[in-house]
Amino acid sequence: MSSFQSATTRQGLHRRNMNSETPQSEFIQRLRRSPPSESSSSTPSSSTTTSSTTTTSNTSGKKKKTAPSASDFYVPSLPGQPKDSQLILYAGHLSFSPPDTTIEPEKDSYGFFFLNKARHIANRPVLLVWLNGGPGCSSFDGSLMEVGPLRMVLKGDGTLKEVDAAWNEYANMLFIDQPTGTGYSYGPKPNYVHELDVSSANLVNLLARFFKIFPEYQQMDLYICGESFAGQYIPYLAQAILDTNIISAPLKGIMIGNGWIDPINQYLAYPEFAFKVGLVNPSSKAADLVNEELKKCTEWIDSNSTTPIHIEACEGILSAITDSTVQTVNSQKMCLNMYDVRLVDSYPACGLTWPPDLADITPYLSRTDVKQALHAQDHAADWVECEAKVGNNFWAKTSQPSVTLFPKLLDKIKILLFSGDQDLICCHTGTERMIDHLTWAGHQGWTSQAINQPWKVNGSYAGLWKEERNLTYVLVANASHMAPYDVPYVTQDMLVRFLGIDVMTAAGPAAQITSRIGEETATKVNRVVMNETKLGQEGSGTTGLAMTSGPVHDENYYNASSAMLFLTLVGLVVGLIFFVRRRLRRDGHGDFAHHPSDETEIILKNHHHHHLSPDSSLPRSARDRQFQPVPTDDLDDHHLHPNLPSNNTSYQDLPR
């Protein structure tokens, strides 16, 4: 194992800490992945916090604390945001302390939230809480690179663009930075969180404060979602919400993408995945090294009755795999990207600096004007994607892996686990092993009734779908550790299916295209023709639609029905005009009957009206967004890293 791998094996899941200080464990640093921050990101600035209390001045000049209102957190716009954007955003700090307590601001700890309201009104109002992993990684990873409505324009000098297929198309998204010291969250030093039950209690307190300020969201279905090490956060938070009486929002389910949930089965799955996809030749010396590390791991497991969240004796397996991929290309050392094995990266990063969006996101979120717009100015230091000190202090020595909570949770709520098939760090084979060894609802693993069903989005293969007894597993095709980054329309379809949202009544981009699991009917909706361009064609994208069973109907049936409806409406309009003309003639208003040009104009206006969508009353920019063609490269865009020797270099192109 190289010295770099020894110091950074744990960076991956949590993302990017390439030179962490006194690493508590190798694997955490790979989960985290970010460069270390020596800045005081957990230290508040000298300004007065406006999160849990709002400061006002009375007539005597003395400052008085008042409870904040929703308007205090409103974000009219962000620097660089499109001028015609109709997003409704709120952001700011909320205390991690219990809602019925008051602590001096300089002694309190604060989480940061970023609320993106739903663009369309769905049949089921939903609030999604999103958490990124780490420990210590900001949820702006999810917001600005995966499921949020805004993206940075690469090398665009801080310019943002609005995207379709965001998860707030049909659900309200609440991104949270936690635990203390993560992203824009802050608190006095030292005040780091060490255990999962503490982090979940802090989140419950923050959510209780959020619902007090935004009470309308407490009536909505509540879901918690995230990825990577959030596979530990999310089940713990779900159980805490079910156990508490200070949050009345109905928790309906959780979603975890490429999650670190069951350490034992995840570690043991590494060799299987590496051999299966060809990262390591099973007959090579590299395979011997991998198997040596696997033996150390299994010996530790067999001799210990407890299961920590990270097992030191098992962390050499991943290092042996990544070390075996190091090659020299054009005088530069290269290795595979552990988050997307289709790609390569410069050694020893091996994916730690991926995706390339971070080069723009990091300076943007450190800008003073951006902090002010987000009401985050009380976080004094520059924004850091993943704070090393948070992860190094999150020991979790007494916390059991979150997989132990699954049987009880599955008795009460739905759980969706999704895995990008190109991820190594939290490979899908580990999630599948976990399910096979999990006992819930009276049975271990899947029963014979549960089968892998092919999942298609707009006619293209999107992955496999399997569900039974409140558990859904989705293997997402052509996707990395950050699946929504690679296939946004596909993962949006996954979301609306799991939430039970009827996009045909909510409109929006997902209503334009088709989605199908197994033998479901694939229904096309919003089949309209504008400027001779037919929307709803097969291509990259998705729809989460009201699902029925039966054969797929012929497209001609829909076209014939649409034509009949159109002719009927035109006939009604013409009949109405004829009736009005006769009535006016009878009443002596003959002038109307002698102006055929006016008559023609009325007919044309009504003819055009029948080609508009149900949302034609929306402002033009909103309508344009709904009728934009769906991108066709959603399923095969690999987002190659800029450090590759050439734009077409993948791991498979390296000499072996």
UniProtKB/Swiss-Prot annotation:
Keywords: Apoptosis, Carboxypeptidase, Glycoprotein, Golgi apparatus, Hydrolase, Membrane, Protease, Signal, Transmembrane, Transmembrane helix. It is found in: Golgi apparatus, trans-Golgi network membrane. One of its GO terms (molecular function) is serine-type carboxypeptidase activity. The chain crosses the membrane at residues 560-580. It is a single-pass type I membrane protein. GO terms for cellular component: membrane; trans-Golgi network. Glycans are attached at N58, N304, N458, N470, N478, N531, N559. The active site is at S228, D423, H481. It catalyses: Preferential release of a C-terminal arginine or lysine residue. Residues 581-656 are cytoplasmic. It is an enzyme of class 3 (hydrolase). PROSITE patterns: CARBOXYPEPT_SER_HIS. GO terms for biological process: apoptotic process; proteolysis. Its EC number is 3.4.16.6. Residues 1-11, 644-656 have a biased composition (Polar residues). Residues 34-60 have a biased composition (Low complexity). Its main location: Golgi. Gene3D superfamilies: alpha/beta hydrolase. Residues 1-79, 608-656 are annotated as: Disordered. Protease with a carboxypeptidase B-like function involved in the C-terminal processing of the lysine and arginine residues from protein precursors. Promotes cell fusion and is involved in the programmed cell death. This is Pheromone-processing carboxypeptidase KEX1. It comes from Puccinia graminis f. sp. tritici (strain CRL 75-36-700-3 / race SCCL) (Black stem rust fungus). The gene is KEX1.
